[in-house]
Swiss-Prot record:
Pfam families assigned: Peripla_BP_4 (PF13407)
Major subcellular site: periplasm
Name recorded for this polypeptide: Autoinducer 2-binding periplasmic protein LuxP
Family per record: Belongs to the bacterial solute-binding protein 2 family.
Biological source species: Vibrio vulnificus (strain YJ016)
GO molecular function per UniProt: carbohydrate binding
Keyword rRNA processing included in the entry's annotation: no
Residue spans crossing the bilayer: none
């Protein structure tokens, strides 16, 4: 396997998921809603899920040449999700004995869009067989529509599991990730257990876009089912630790009467923890989102109260298996979501270690 690594810094500064998700995310099919509306998709997704959980079976089809894969990921952040995801993908591809070349570009979330667009256009000009990207902003969507309309490159959209309704006749090759609504609802259910008498809370969003809508608005919608919970404030961030710190300070200075803060990402949560310590407000509970290494370390020392932990490597494995199916001429599902587990600081180290072995079964390998 030939590997081309371009590490670039492009910066300018299971749970029951209710049917309301498509109301929160206008213009998208909710994950379960899509699988129910298109039953054959449900069958394919379940088949892929079983393959992901099982040992790899090497490719038997002949390859005349290596496939070419371009990856544009927002990997430059404290959360190790993206780096681990790509590591799991490559290791599973190797186990499947697929011959491939990969070109990687890591950016920051909320990065300079012009620079990001240059990297994406270069990926298309290289005539990659597969392009792995994400969808968070309107500009991302315009580029994706260009790819769907005018390129033979097959598009894998990472970190999104809600198919775009307007693309009904020309969907990407695969949507893959951990369903933001499912994870957010799991956290909402846990907060309701922690505060049976109700509570006041604040929300710290990611940067403006799909992730904030899917994680933040879904959580608020779920908490609104009970009149015992009151949203006191909500702030968008720049999706960084520094902006999480500043937003948490601003929120608490203006609305100090809160019992917990709901954070929409790792970096935002870790910044907010620093603010809570500085203000002497460590009585306020705060969650993480994703359960990567940084969050689990924070839980171990008691800084973070809870998180929803992605079985991280599921999605990297799913991408590799979907490509294998494609090479073999099999029908690939449109969407795949990996598994979650809620983790709290009260959980035993032994229990968390078992979850880590499952979540990082490839990405922790040397």
């Amino acid at each position: 396997m030939k590997k081309i690594l371009l590490t670039c810094l492009l910066a300018s500064a299971s749970f029951q998921v209710s049917s309301h998700t498509s109301e929160v995310l206008s213009g998208y099919w909710a994950y379960q809603e899509f699988l129910e509306k298109f039953p054959q998709q449900g069958v394919l997704t379940r088949e892929l899920s079983e393959v992901v959980r099982n040992a790899p079976v090497p490719l038997k089809s002949h390859q005349s040449k290596p496939i070419r894969i371009s990856v544009v990921f927002p990997g430059q952040q404290i959360s190790d999700y993206w780096v681990r995801n790509l590591s799991a993908f490559e290791k599973r591809m190797d186990k499947l004995q697929i011959s491939y070349q990969i070109n990687q570009v890591f950016t920051r979330p909320n990065a300079d869009v012009k620079q990001q667009s240059v990297s994406l256009m270069e990926a298309l000009k290289s005539k990659s067989d597969y392009l792995i990207f994400t969808l968070d902003t309107t500009r991302h969507r315009k580029f994706i529509e260009h790819v769907l309309d005018s390129s033979e490159t097959k598009l894998i959209l990472q970190n999104i599991t809600t198919p775009v309704q307007a693309w009904d006749k020309r969907q990407p090759f695969l949507y893959v990730g951990f369903d933001h609504a499912e994870g957010s609802i799991a956290l909402a259910d846990k907060f309701k257990q922690l505060y049976p008498q109700g509570a006041n809370y604040s929300v710290l969003y990611f940067s403006e876009g799909y992730v904030s809508d899917a994680r933040g608005d879904t959580f608020i919608h779920q908490m609104n089912h009970s009149d015992r919970f009151a949203l006191k404030s909500s702030f968008y961030t720049k999706a960084t630790k520094a902006s999480g710190y500043e937003s948490a300070k601003n929120s608490l200075e203006r609305y100090p009467d809160v019992d917990f803060i709901y954070a929409c990402s790792t970096d935002v949560a870790l910044g907010a923890i620093d603010a809570l310590k500085e203000l002497g407000r460590t009585n306020i509970k705060i969650n993480g989102w994703g359960g990567g290494s940084a969050e689990l370390d924070a839980i171990a020392v008691g800084d973070l109260d809870l998180t929803v932990m992605r079985m991280n490597d599921d999605t990297g494995i799913a991408m590799a298996e979907a490509i294998k199916w494609d090479i073999e001429g099999r029908t690939v599902p449109t969407v795949f979501s990996g598994d979650f587990e809620v983790v709290t600081k009260e959980d035993s180290p032994e229990h968390i270690e078992l979850l880590k072995k499952r979540a990082f079964r490839y990405s922790d390998q040397p």
